[in-house]
Amino acid sequence: MRILHVLDHSIPLQSGYTFRTLAILEQQRALGWETVHLTSPKHTEPFVPQEQVDGWAFWRTPPATTAFSRLPVLREWALMRQTEQRLLEVIAEEEPDIIHAHSPVLNAIPAIRAGKRAGIPVVYEVRAFWEDAAASHGTGQEFGPRYKATRYLETWALKHADAVTTICEGLRSDIVGRGISPEKVTVIPNAVNADEFTGGGTPDPALLQTLGLTGKSVMDFVGSFYGYEGLHLLCQAMPQILTALPDTKLLLVGGGPEDENLKSLAAKLDLNDHVIFSGRVPHDQVQKYYDLIDLLVYPRVRIRLTDLVTPLKPLEAMAMNKVLIASDVGGHHELIRDGETGTMFKAGDVVDLADTVLRVLKNREDWPRQLAAGREFVANERSWKNSVANYVDVYGRLTTRT
């Protein structure tokens, strides 16, 4: 079986999106399937028609260059037109059995149109809804005209795809609520390869000293600094935490739109000696930073996106044998068993966040139990091998039907 994956972007770019994609491709190859890969014009590397990256071959789509391709709405239409045209070229060359379009809907609509023309079934995989992602990043207004138009396009794609997959139960419920048959929607949950993660590594003394963390209790967040991650709440909780445990440090690894705002907030709260910004770290160096920490914190605020979508980071924390705290948004509830594999606090509540951090830091004798439970959960219930195996039935139904 040959599957043509239609992607927003791919490696060598690094994101949760590309990590999930690569895990899916690796496991599909392990099942004996052939995979072919096309990225949209939004892939930001300089355009080349085809590219090899770490042994993976990618077809690339040229950017739209017409005058109207820089105008709102018309820009998106131009992107979809370019993707559809490139898809038809790749279909003719590769002759896939299935087209598998991954979020956003800008990939799904061209895939559905090209699939209909070529007589090939199309799977649409929803990782998040484009309208919610735009609202959370500040590029769109929730329930505004653009939001409603995008929601209409998403629903159209869900109805016209031959099958729908998604990453979690929250998104599945929303999809079914749009009138899509439950039998049409399959959850392919986010997962990890636990064997690829090491836990309890020895901290690098030189790195500890460089960051000023020697002899300190270290809380950490590793990832992109978006507003919905709630890192401002973590900074606001630090004064209360420091009053009780003055040797606590907060290490923020990464960067993003909120970077400067967070640095300004830390300075305003007189936390420059207690909140450490490492900047972005190469992927192969991230483990060194994880080895420094006692506690991972995921303080996401409650919005539609965080209630519906499950992140990868808490699963990675469990795989690395790290103690974790997370807000009680819906996406976290699907991944974390409160008091068993992690500890949850009331989303948006700075006092409860601080109280929870202090309770966990003062109760280290309970850590081995939680660490073992988390590691067992990801090994038994959230492996990529088990997750990707769910595609067997999805693809099988489509190829039998055709």
Predicted regions and their residues:
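Carbohydrate-associated surface elements
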Residues: G170, A191
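N-terminal subdomain of nucleotide-sugar transferases
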Residues: M1-P62, I241, T402
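Nucleotide-activated donor-binding/catalytic signature segment of Leloir-type glycosyltransferases, i.e.
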Residues: E260-Q287
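A short, well-ordered alpha-helix in the C-terminal region of glycosyltransferases
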Residues: D352, R359, D366-E381, D393
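Acidic donor-binding loop of glycosyltransferase active sites
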Residues: E94-I98, D162, H274, Y290-D307, ...
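Short hydrophobic beta-strand element within catalytic cores of glycosyltransferases
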Residues: Y298, E316-A319, V323-A326, I336, ...
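Conserved donor-binding/catalytic core segment of Leloir-type glycosyltransferases
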Residues: L4-V6, L213-M238
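Conserved acidic donor-binding segment of nucleotide-sugar-dependent glycosyltransferases
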Residues: D338-G339, T343-V350, R359-E365
